[in-house]
């Protein structure tokens, strides 16, 4: 934070807005407004200016001066809760650099204008310029923050398949009987395949264990021999995907 006695051109860090020419402050706020997505040619309806004493006492909440643009005059009372000031000064929506506190929704629903001493929804101290776009007196107050996206359409529900008969007695047609027999044959085929595959794995595991003992014996008898080329290693887990078939 800068020295209050400094004559820097950076108006965003000036502790007292009354010491800054309004044109300079308005131009600075306009640049911030346009950088944040505001219309490049539209004038600012109002400017919220942070009051930052030097040094900022610990725990002190930041207050803001409100200015009506482009008249070039500051409102006399600092606003400690600028996120609600738009209702009092006909600005439909603030356009802040930082996030707005959650308590603003409660005040917005009640339609109450903020008082100068109200600290219920004060934002943390921030040396930034705030701008509020589109202050038409007759315009309806808009919700603060980014527009909410439209809710996504719910996916269509799947139609449930009719229950398949579990016995020949439940079959109502020749087609149902044929499908039932095919399902029974398929289940038997899968069960037989899994049984044979499991038996193969057990035999291969025993063979792998025998190969390991033989490999160790050959290495002890002839250390220079490339045993792995003679007796290849067998993976510990065989056909795991097929077992889950």
From Swiss-Prot:
The subunit structure is: Homodimer. Interacts (via b-ZIP domain) with the DNA polymerase processivity factor BMRF1 (via N-terminus); this interaction may inhibit BZLF1-induced transcription of the BMRF1 promoter. Interacts with human UBN1, CRTC2 and RACK1. Interacts (via N-terminus) with human PAX5 (via N-terminus); this interaction inhibits BZLF1-mediated lytic viral reactivation. Interacts (via leucine-zipper domain) with host CEBPA; this interaction induces G1 host cell cycle arrest.
Which PROSITE patterns does the protein's record reference? BZIP_BASIC
The UniProt annotation puts the region (Disordered) at 140-167
Q: Which residues carry this modification: Phosphothreonine?
A: 14, 159
Family annotation (InterPro entries): bZIP, bZIP_sf, BZLF1_HHV-4
Site (Recognition of methylation, required for disruption of latency) location in chain: 186
Span list, region Basic motif:
178-195
Task: Write down what this protein is called.
Answer: Lytic switch protein BZLF1
An individual GO BP term:
symbiont-mediated perturbation of host cell cycle G0/G1 transition checkpoint
Source species, please? Answer: Epstein-Barr virus (strain AG876) (HHV-4)
Q: Name one GO molecular function term.
A: DNA-binding transcription factor activity
């Amino acid at each position: 934070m800068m020295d209050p006695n400094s004559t820097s051109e950076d108006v965003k860090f000036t502790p007292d807005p009354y010491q800054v020419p309004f044109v300079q402050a308005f131009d600075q706020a306009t640049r911030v407004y346009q950088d944040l997505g505001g219309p490049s040619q539209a004038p600012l309806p109002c400017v919220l200016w942070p009051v930052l004493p030097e040094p900022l006492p610990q725990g002190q909440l930041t207050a803001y001066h409100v200015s009506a643009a482009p008249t070039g005059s500051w409102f006399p009372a600092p606003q400690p809760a600028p996120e609600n000031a738009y209702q009092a000064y006909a600005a439909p929506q603030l356009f802040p650099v930082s996030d707005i506190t959650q308590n603003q929704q409660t005040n917005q629903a009640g339609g109450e204008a903020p008082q100068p001493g109200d600290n219920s929804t004060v934002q943390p101290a921030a040396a930034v310029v705030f701008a509020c776009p589109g202050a038409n007196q007759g315009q309806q107050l808009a919700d603060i923050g980014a527009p909410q996206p439209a809710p996504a359409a719910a996916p269509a529900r799947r139609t449930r398949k009719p229950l398949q008969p579990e016995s020949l007695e439940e079959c109502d047609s020749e087609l149902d009987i044929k499908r039932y027999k095919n399902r029974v044959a398929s289940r038997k085929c899968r069960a037989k395949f899994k049984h044979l595959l499991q038996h193969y794995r057990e035999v291969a595991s025993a063979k792998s264990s025998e190969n390991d003992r033989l490999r160790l014996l050959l290495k002890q008898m002839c250390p220079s021999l490339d045993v792995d080329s003679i007796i290849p290693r067998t993976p510990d887990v065989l056909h795991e995907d097929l077992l889950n078939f």
